UniProtKB/Swiss-Prot annotation:
GO annotation, cellular component aspect: phenylalanine-tRNA ligase complex
UniProt xrefs under NCBIfam families: pheT_bact, YtpR
Highest rank taxon of the organism: Bacteria
Protein name: Phenylalanine--tRNA ligase beta subunit
S-S bridge residues: none
Assembly and oligomerization: Tetramer of two alpha and two beta subunits.
Residues of the B5 domain: 399-474
Lineage: Bacteria, Pseudomonadati, Pseudomonadota, Betaproteobacteria, Burkholderiales
């Protein structure tokens, strides 16, 4: 909201400067976003009167003016402005004047004729971009008067950034109330005595929708002169408040809206074809608005109709059909209280906004409508003339303002400072909040213009604002420092984040709400948790997997020429669970486990001239996952399985101690192609609880004996997983004390014979490497051979394996 300081000071004029005024408003919650001068700095410009004008002897487009600048002698000024004429009052930059931009005025000869100064346009003074001619000033201004004083150009324009709850401050009067409360300066509110009623013409109005309109008032005014000029003082205030002057009737309506916060509408009475009705629109109805936009209406939008013809979009904008023009003679002046809920969001549906809707959807004073009708009428009669009829005022459904109780002790506790009872009473009085004292409580009845006061904390906020946040002492919080034991067997989210980051992954944070298609495609979830009020229409469901969001970020980076992307996210997912009840951290019916997901795409390692380039694959990311589990990695199992987001032949279910904890695999080719990725990213998703638990390190004796390495190659069924054989080896070691010296076993080679035409390969060779070491003695060949034989026998018995020659 923008307004000139002079307008504000016409209602309340505290003895403080502009900067202090801006500071106090900001500290009271009315943020002054910007202050700027009404005009740029310039000097030496005065009011002047063109006494005579003659053609230039050597230039057709120039004229020689004799100008009275109040000094007692006429100045000769050469001017080329098309509107220069005798009798005109204009700005004159005297010799020695300095204009915006640093231009200095001196005596000059123009085509042989001396010019002692310059007559100025609005653009040359920095007042507007208008340079079509000289700036015409009111004839009543005295020549020689400094132009800055004559036009109040030292005024300051305030721009406020208001919060949505402070609708009462969307007017000069509202801001003036605040200034009066903050400074204790008396407030002079705009007022008008009821105008004499000289005609008895009325326009019947029926309110058919009390849930739309709670109060409707209006009056007929006949014989107005719509061509009357808007007074300069009003035009200046409107322009400095960011409003364009249109015509006297429109300007008066806008002026009162800005001054007292009362949107109103002026109908051309002769264009209204019947009695007025206020109702909800009907399907199929249309309206051409004042901005030229034609809109299709529906029952969710309020309208004012004449007979069956829609004339106005209630609380938003009038219609073109009944708009006033310069030929208008008779008008109907309307002001109403529209329920905020009935106006909110309606203008945005039609992709525009209006000053009226901006105010009505936040709440406009419903008690002062008759007084404001009189104020507007007085201005119309004074400027445009006419005869006023009686005011018809219908009240059908006004808000009931329930008293709000504020406990003084509660106020002290919330603010952290003991504001005296007398000062609290004074604050409420200065704010215009009627109250009663009941013991240590204040019972306040919110005024009709304060829609933001509903609960006790609202009143405490009012006390804090006027008391002054700067007066509240800074008190550091005091708490008993208590050491909490951190269990070694469990790690927190930050520790897990550091682990993943150490594996060359970068953390991202996505929205928890996603597209419904993502849930269906990536998680196979046809019944996700849906949002009642999504922030965007496509983000309509809660995610049950983190994978889709990571793939979307990979796509975003790939489109921007990134060739290697490694990301992770730690966040909650949402699953339906009818068995889950409400709790401190739970919502009934929705399970919210914490998950860790990662994605790797592009090169397996950073590009380096001495290292062959290859794409990251399943086993690279499998190694990353195993590294996250540390000593518990030997309890991990990767079981071939299918998941909607993953490649059917390159995906695995991750199990820990036999329990499923997540998934690992390449992205499904369909989703890879859909994301326009030239090769598939590898993704994983893990239950955080499985990662949080860790195995404590066990101290064991460090062997001084050399290790022995032996290899064993076996033929087995081609479909047998290598992990099954490693599990058999681990079971044999645990069961047989003689195998306690076997420290590790790994697969180091897989070999298959080339298939013969028409035949399938039924066997494969798996080569295992074993590390054997004793802590007491050096192992001899007999002991080593015996251990390898025992392992081979266990594998033969369990998997029908045979040793490869």
């Amino acid at each position: 909201m923008q307004f000139p300081e002079s307008w504000l000071r016409s209602l309340v004029n505290p003895s403080i400067g502009t900067d202090e005024l801006a500071h106090r408003l900001t500290m009271a919650g009315l943020e002054v976003e910007e202050t700027e001068p009404a005009a740029p700095p310039f000097t030496g410009v005065v009011v002047a009167h063109i006494v005579d004008i003659a053609p230039h002897p050597d230039a057709d487009k120039l004229r020689v003016c004799q100008v009275d600048d109040g000094s007692g002698a006429l100045l000769q000024i050469v001017c080329g402005a098309p509107n220069a004429a005798a009798g005109l009052t204009v700005p004159l930059a005297r010799v020695g004047a300095e204009l915006p931009g640093g231009m200095k005025i001196g005596v000059a000869k123009m085509r042989g004729v001396q010019s002692s100064g310059m007559l100025c346009s609005a653009r040359e003074l920095g007042l507007s971009q208008d340079h079509a001619g000289l700036l015409e000033l009111p004839a009543a201004l005295r020549p020689g008067t400094d132009i800055r004083a004559a036009l109040d150009l030292d005024d300051t324009l305030f721009t406020l950034k208001l919060t949505p709850n402070r609708a009462d401050c969307l007017s000069i009067l509202g801001v003036a109330r605040e200034v009066a409360a903050l400074t204790g300066t008396p407030l002079t509110a705009p007022a008008a005595e009821p105008v004499p009623v000289t005609i008895d013409h009325r326009l019947p109005v029926a309110i058919q929708a009390p849930d739309l309109c709670g109060r409707f008032a209006g009056r007929v005014i006949q014989g107005v002169n719509a061509r009357a000029a808007t007074p300069e003082w009003m035009k200046t205030r409107l322009e400095r408040a960011g409003q364009r002057s249109v015509s006297a009737l429109v300007d008066i309506s806008n002026y009162v809206m800005l001054e007292v916060g009362r949107p109103s509408h002026v109908f051309d009475l002769d264009k209204i074809g019947g009695d007025l009705s206020v109702r909800w629109a009907r399907e199929g109805e249309t309206l051409e608005l004042l901005n030229g936009q034609a809109v299709a209406l529906d029952p969710k939008v309020g309208v004012v109709v004449a007979g069956e013809q829609v004339e106005s979009l209630a609380g938003i904008m009038g219609g073109e059909a009944t708009s006033v023009t310069l030929d208008t003679r008779n008008i109907y002046l309307e002001a109403a209280f529209w329920w905020p809920g009935a106006i909110a969001g309606r203008a945005r549906r039609y992709k525009f906004s209006s000053e009226a809707s901006h105010r009505f959807e936040r709440g406009v004073d419903y008690a002062s409508i008759p007084e404001h009708i009189e104020l507007i009428t007085r201005l119309i009669l004074d400027i445009c003339g006419g005869q006023a009829g009686p005011v018809d005022d219908q009240c059908v459904n006004l808000p009931v303002r329930e008293p709000v109780r504020m406990r003084l002790a509660r106020c002290h506790r919330v603010l952290g400072v003991a504001v005296e009872r007398a000062e609290v009473a004074q604050i409420f009085t200065r704010l215009g909040l009627p109250f009663q004292e009941q013991g240590d409580d204040f019972v306040v009845t919110p005024p009709s213009y304060r829609f933001d006061i509903e609960i006790e904390e609202d009143l405490i906020e009012e006390v804090a604002r006027v008391y002054g946040f700067e007066r509240i002492p800074d008190v550091p919080p005091v708490a008993r420092a208590k050491m909490h034991a951190q269990p070694e067997a469990r790690r927190g989210a930050h520790a897990v984040r550091r682990l993943v980051a150490a594996r060359d992954y970068q953390e991202v944070v996505n929205y928890s709400f996603v597209e419904a298609a993502w849930e269906r495609d990536y998680a196979g979830n046809d019944n996700p948790v849906r949002l009642v009020n999504p922030i965007a229409s496509h983000l309509s469901v809660m995610r049950s997997s983190l994978i889709a969001g990571l793939v979307a970020i990979v796509r975003h980076n790939a489109n921007r020429k990134q060739s290697r992307v490694r990301l992770f996210e730690l966040g909650r997912v949402f699953h339906r669970d009818p068995q889950l009840a409400d709790g401190p951290l739970e919502v009934a019916g929705v399970r919210q486990p914490l998950m860790l997901a990662g994605v790797a795409w592009g090169g397996a390692v950073e590009e380096q001239w001495g290292v062959p380039h290859r794409q990251v694959d399943f086993y690279d990311v499998k190694q990353d996952v195993e590294a996250l589990f540390g000593a518990r990695a030997d309890a991990l199992r990767f079981v071939a399985d299918r998941y909607p987001a993953l490649h059917p032949g390159r995906s695995a279910r991750i199990e820990l101690d036999g329990q499923p904890i997540g998934w690992l695999g390449e992205l499904h080719p369909q989703w890879t192609q859909q994301a326009d990725l030239h090769h598939a990213p590898v993704v994983f998703e893990l239950d955080f609880e499985a990662l949080a638990e860790r195995r404590l390190p066990a101290v064991r004796e460090l062997s001084r004996q050399p290790a022995v390495v032996r290899d064993l190659a076996l033929w087995v069924d081609a479909k047998l997983p290598a992990q099954a054989m490693l599990d058999t080896v681990a079971a044999a070691i645990a069961r047989d004390p003689q195998l306690s010296v076997v420290q590790d076993a790994q697969v180091f080679d897989v070999w298959r014979e080339k298939p013969v035409a028409g035949q399938t390969v039924t066997e494969k060779s798996l080569a295992f490497r074993f590390w054997l070491q004793d802590t007491e003695v050096t192992l001899d060949e007999a002991r080593v051979a015996d251990c390898i034989a025992r392992i081979k026998d266990a594998l033969v018995a369990a998997h029908n394996a045979r040793q490869r020659a």
